[in-house]
Structure formats: structure tokens, C-alpha cells
């Protein structure tokens, strides 16, 4: 079962631009293993649009999802920079420092920063 959760991609974000993101906790029903994943896209007008897409996908795999909060990601692939900032009106502010740690594992050669700035 452990490998199934490991198979879920930790990060799925747009390759370029500024867009909303959410931090989602996956958990096996009844506790047990859990992990946090980052999802973000320009296609989402609101943070809950991202959650409404990821939640059924994860439920199919047998996980419960909880949104830990949201914010924005500014992804500059040319300069290899990612900035995490802002918050979600509906879900509150994600712990951006957690998000950055997850992003650093995927984008190893990037400069990744975060702040509580709104813009």
C-alpha cells in the first residue's frame, strides 16, 4: 500500500505564470500513512476548483483528502525561480514553508522562496 501513495505525484503545477495553488493532505481512511501534495494551475479561478478536481482522483485511489490551505505560486521556468505567497479566501493560508520543502524536492535546481505577501 505504501508504494501506491508514493506513486502519487507530490507536485503538479503549471510550468509558467502566476496561479492559485493548494496544499492537500492525503490520508488512508482510519489514519495510517499520510503525505502532503501541492497542486496549482492557471485554469482554476478559485482554490476550490483545484480541490474539486484532485479530491475525486484521490478518492478513487482510496485516500481521504484535506485541503490544508492555499495561496499563489509564481513560476518562472526561464530563470528557475518559484515564489510562493498569498492565501486562499476559502481555505485560509497554507503553510508556505511546507509547500517550499515539497517543491524543492521536485525542482532541485530552482531558487524557491515564500512570503506572506498578498501580491
State what each model feature region is.
Residues 1-119:
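Intrinsic low-complexity, intrinsically disordered or marginally ordered coil/linker segments
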Amino acid at each position: 500500500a505504501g508504494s501506491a501513495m508514493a506513486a502519487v505525484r507530490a507536485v503538479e503545477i503549471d510550468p509558467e505564470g502566476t496561479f492559485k495553488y493548494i496544499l492537500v493532505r492525503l490520508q488512508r481512511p482510519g489514519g495510517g500513512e499520510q503525505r502532503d501534495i501541492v497542486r496549482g494551475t492557471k485554469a482554476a479561478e478559485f482554490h476550490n476548483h483545484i480541490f474539486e478536481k484532485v479530491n475525486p482522483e484521490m478518492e478513487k485511489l482510496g485516500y481521504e483528502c484535506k485541503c490544508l490551505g492555499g495561496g499563489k505560486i509564481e513560476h518562472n521556468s526561464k530563470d528557475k525561480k518559484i515564489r510562493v505567497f498569498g492565501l486562499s479566501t476559502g481555505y485560509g493560508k497554507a503553510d508556505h514553508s511546507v509547500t517550499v520543502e515539497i517543491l524543492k524536492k521536485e525542482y532541485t535546481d530552482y531558487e524557491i522562496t515564500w512570503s506572506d505577501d498578498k501580491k
